[in-house]
Amino acid sequence: MGYKIRTVQLSDAEAILKVYAPFITDTCISFEYVVPSVEEFAQRIASISAEYPYIVLEEDGEIVGYAYSHRYLERVAYSWDVEVTIYLAPKVQGKGLGVILYDALEKLMALQNIKNLYSCITGDNVHSIEMHRSMGYELIGTFPKAGFKHDRWLDVVWMAKTIGEKENAPLPFVPFAEVEASKIEEVLGKINI
C-alpha cells in the first residue's frame, strides 16, 4: 500500500467528511451532533487552511485521515498557540500513521513559529490520549462532564506540548499561506511512510 501526506485542497472536502462523519454519528469522539454539509465543511477547510496547516493522509489515492491546527484563542498574546485535531479512518488506526501525520503537522507549524500545541480529547478516548502522550503531550486539565452526547455526560481532557525554543521575544506568527511552498514541500517530502 502506498501512503502519502499532502496539503489539503478544497476539492477534498467530501472525502475528508467521509472520514469524519462516523465520528459524529457513531461515537462521542466528536462533540458535533449533526454531520455538516460538504459545502459547510469546505468553508471550514478554506477558513482554517488560509492561516494554518491542514494536511491529509492518502492510502493509494484515497483520503484515510487528516490533521490540522487552528487558532486556540483570539487575543494577540495567544498568536503562538494552536489547537490540533486529527482523525483517521478505522482501517488505518493502530498502524502508527497518526504519529507520522502529527509529526508532519508539527514540522509545518514550526515554520510558522508556533510554540504551544493543545489538544482537546474526550476523556474515554484512551487511544488518542496515549498517542498524544507518546508524542510528548502532557495532561494539563480535565473538564468533568463537560459535554453531553449519546445519552451520557463526558469528561474532556486537555493535553499540551511545546515545540521549539521559547525566546524572550518570539518571532512573529507566519500565516500558512505565507510560508514558502518550497519549505512545505521539503517537510512533506521527508516523510517516510
PLM features: residue spans?
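Acetyl-CoA-dependent GNAT
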Residues: 36-91, 102-103, 162-163
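Conserved GNAT acetyl-CoA-binding A-motif
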Residues: 109-121
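Conserved acetyl-CoA-binding loop-helix of GNAT-fold acetyltransferases
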Residues: 94-107, 130-134
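A short beta-loop-alpha structural element at the N-terminal edge
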Residues: 4-16
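Glycine-rich acetyl-CoA-binding "A-motif" of GNAT/NAT acetyltransferases
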Residues: 62-65, 127, 153
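Acidic/histidine-enriched, glycine/proline-rich intrinsically disordered or flexible terminal extensions
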Residues: 165-193
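Conserved GNAT-fold acetyl-CoA-binding loop/helix
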Residues: 17, 21-44
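Conserved catalytic-core motifs of GNAT/GCN5-like acyltransferases
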Residues: 118-121, 133, 138-155, 164-165, ...
